[in-house]
């Protein structure tokens, strides 16, 4: 049975700087698109700089945020309502050829140790849902979820060797494994509705395209070892986190920075 959920989301990010900025440019991948599995009812960005919208190479709705000289705070609030229905398979007739996601990317490279581990475990290329979930289960066991053990630049191989990481690391390891087994895979950034959770954060999972000619993608949440469902809101996709992180950029000046993030996700009455 299809379950439809309407989620109200508010995501506030603040950077505070010890001294005035000379200049800063940020790329924001904070605008979800309507498509298979989700419908955006309304969405807005409230930021401290000037926004320049564009569509990036991976088909994401993105914005460049330009900050003027003299600012000591960078503020970005994304908010809106998205209706989800838990559709795990997403047709994508347009966009890049799925086979571009067979190429390794800096944060999702399958090294020799990972390759040997997958071979010893007898894991097959994830050509269907059952095989994809078996691989996700193995990755979740090899890279146990533990906050604070990795950072934004941790690679799949490093997380695999360390045996711990967060959703980002588990997604990178899964993506690297799929590519190594010959199946196009990409990283997904978004939100996960977890009622009752005291510490919400943005989430990451993966999508695979078992048959590139069909151009259908299957969403797999490695952290929760399951298909994506109505709890997931998809923001952006790319080869890895570096290509589609919610906020990334460069700055000149500012000195030390302090980052604070607030995230609220509430299910609205039907």
Cite the ranges covered by each PLM segment:
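Generic structural hydrophobic/aromatic packing signal, biased to beta-strands
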Residues: 28-30, 45-47, 78, 118, ...
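Structural beta-strand/beta-sheet cores of well-ordered domains, especially the beta-sheet scaffolds
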Residues: 5, 11, 26, 78, ...
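Intrinsically disordered, low-complexity coil segments
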Residues: 3, 122-127, 211-216
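Hydrophobic/aromatic-rich core segments of domains that either
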Residues: 24, 137, 169-255
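Linear, non-domain "peripheral" regions
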Residues: 1-119
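Ser/Thr-centric signal marking residues that sit
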Residues: 13, 150, 223
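A short, structured loop/turn motif at beta-sheet edges
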Residues: 70-73, 128, 181, 211-213
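Secondary-structure boundary elements
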Residues: 82-84, 91-165, 173, 241, ...
């Amino acid at each position: 049975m299809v379950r439809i959920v309407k989620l109200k989301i508010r995501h506030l990010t603040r950077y505070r700087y010890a001294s005035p900025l000379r200049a800063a440019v940020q790329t924001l991948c904070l605008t979800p698109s309507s498509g298979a599995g989700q419908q955006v009812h309304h969405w807005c960005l409230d930021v401290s700089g000037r926004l320049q919208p564009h569509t990036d190479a991976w088909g994401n709705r993105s914005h460049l945020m330009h900050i003027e000289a003299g600012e000591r705070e960078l503020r970005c609030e994304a908010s809106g309502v998205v209706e989800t229905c838990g559709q795990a398979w997403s047709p994508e007739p347009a966009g890049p050829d799925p086979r571009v996601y067979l190429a390794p990317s800096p944060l999702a490279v399958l090294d020799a140790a990972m390759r040997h581990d997958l071979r010893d475990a007898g894991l097959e290329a994830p050509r269907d849902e059952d095989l994809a979930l078996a691989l996700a289960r193995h990755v979740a066991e090899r890279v146990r979820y533990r906050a604070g053990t990795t950072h934004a630049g941790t690679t799949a191989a490093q997380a695999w060797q360390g045996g711990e990481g967060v959703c980002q690391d588990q997604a990178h390891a899964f993506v690297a494994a799929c590519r190594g087994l010959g199946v196009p895979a990409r990283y997904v950034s978004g939100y996960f509705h977890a009622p009752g959770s005291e510490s919400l954060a943005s989430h990451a999972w993966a999508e695979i395209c078992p048959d590139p000619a069909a151009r259908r993608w299957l969403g797999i949440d490695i952290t929760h070892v399951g298909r994506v469902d109505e709890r997931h809101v998809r923001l952006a996709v790319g080869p890895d986190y570096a290509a589609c992180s919610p906020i990334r950029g460069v700055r000149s000046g500012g000195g030390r920075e302090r980052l604070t993030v607030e995230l609220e996700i509430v299910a609205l009455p039907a």
